[in-house]
Regions:
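Alpha-helical segment proximal to the catalytic Tyr-Lys
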Residues: 130, 175-179, 239
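Short C-terminal tail/terminal secondary-structure segment
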Residues: 2, 151, 231, 242-258
Length: 258
């Protein structure tokens, strides 16, 4: 057994069938973890997506639920506990991003983003920590924030705000739950080569020029490097960390981009 061995970890990850989530799930399974993947997509679609990413391992299970809804989250935990046992690591990873100039950002889209990025993280973290306290489990919460918690990126202002708020949420859980042996940390990736950022990088020269300038290391972040951060935070190597943000952004937050 090594310090990065996760065979004693049962991990629930929300948003686990998404572009980054699938890579994280694969890495967790490769390091021996039992992984409960939560997302909103139908099970057959999720299984295909996970399989295409090489993440549909024997110790990986899928659980469909809307993580913004407390009743559904309670049912999710009941189902996970019945199937693989009570998770001792819960990753609040579900999230979304959309791009509009700040004065053109529709309020209904702002509400939807905050609902998923922030409310869901609170609902899931609260459900997990209540169960850990009841069962005297020293659990670990991991929140996915972003480098834009510190350096706002243009045209995604609500996303920037949601990630800054998520850092505060994480630190609140860490502060209040430490007496119960429960830890909370966050991971803050940079400009990852998936989803909207990758599409804009490939199709919009102005975005690529701006993003290239914002990344001191000069290239988009591979999702595998984000997964490496999750492995570290889940491992015994990070056992004395709580209330901390693991910033792995290629240097994006070192200075303003303009």
């Amino acid at each position: 057994m090594t310090l990065l061995d996760l065979t004693n970890k049962t991990v629930l990850i929300t948003g686990g069938a998404g572009a980054i989530g699938r890579v994280v799930v694969r890495a967790l399974a490769e390091h021996g973890a039992t992984v409960a993947v939560n997302d909103v997509m139908p099970e057959d679609e999720a299984r295909v997506a996970l399989a295409e990413a090489g993440a549909m391992a024997p110790r990986v299970s899928y659980f469909r639920a809307d993580s913004t809804q407390p009743e559904m989250v309670d049912h999710l935990f009941d189902h996970v506990v019945h199937t693989v046992g009570l998770p001792n690591v819960v990753c609040c990873h579900a999230g979304m991003v959309e791009s509009f100039p700040v004065n053109e950002y529709p309020v209904e889209k702002y509400d939807a983003l905050m609902n998923l990025n922030l409310r869901a993280s609170f609902v899931v973290a609260q459900a997990a920590s209540r169960r850990w306290i009841a069962n005297k489990v020293s659990g670990l919460l991991i929140f996915t924030t972003s480098w834009v918690q510190d350096v706002p990126w243009p045209e995604i202002t609500p996303y920037n705000a949601s990630k800054a708020a998520m850092r505060a949420l994480m630190r609140g859980f860490a502060r209040e739950l430490a007496p119960h042996g429960i830890r909370a940390n966050a991971i803050a990736p940079g400009i990852v080569a998936v989803g909207m950022a990758k599409r804009q990088w490939d199709t919009e020269p102005s975005y690529r020029a701006r993003a290239s300038k914002a990344i001191p290391l000069g290239q988009m972040q591979p999702p595998e490097s984000v997964a490496h951060g999750f492995i570290f935070l889940c491992s015994d190597m990070a056992a004395y960390m709580t209330g901390a943000v693991l910033l792995m952004d290629g240097g994006c937050s070192l200075y303003p981009m303009d």
